């Protein structure tokens, strides 16, 4: 999954953002599971990228008023 930029996130509909957020959170969970199992991640910087992208999506959801949590 590609890391999203702010313009790409803003162009999405609220439903698309929700689906993308769910996919990103699942991917982050999988990366953390690899670390917890004692494995080495393929790309160590990926976890930070995922966290930042999730934060971007949530920030834009708040700005747009479509945040569900």
UniProtKB/Swiss-Prot annotation:
GO terms for cellular component: ribonucleoprotein complex; ribosome. SUPFAM superfamilies: Ribosomal protein L29 (L29p) (SSF46561). InterPro entries: Ribosomal_uL29, Ribosomal_uL29_CS, Ribosomal_uL29_sf. GO terms for molecular function: structural constituent of ribosome. Keywords: Ribonucleoprotein, Ribosomal protein. Pfam families: Ribosomal_L29. It comes from the Archaea. GO terms for biological process: translation. Belongs to the universal ribosomal protein uL29 family. HAMAP family: Ribosomal_uL29. This is Large ribosomal subunit protein uL29. It comes from Natronomonas pharaonis (strain ATCC 35678 / DSM 2160 / CIP 103997 / JCM 8858 / NBRC 14720 / NCIMB 2260 / Gabara).
């Amino acid at each position: 999954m590609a890391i999203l930029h702010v313009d790409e996130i803003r162009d999405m509909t609220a439903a698309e953002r929700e689906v993308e957020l769910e996919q990103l959170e699942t991917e982050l969970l999988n990366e953390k599971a690899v670390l917890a199992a004692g494995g080495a991640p393929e790309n160590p910087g990926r976890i930070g990228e995922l966290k930042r992208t999730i934060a971007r999506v949530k920030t834009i959801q708040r700005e747009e008023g479509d945040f569900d949590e």
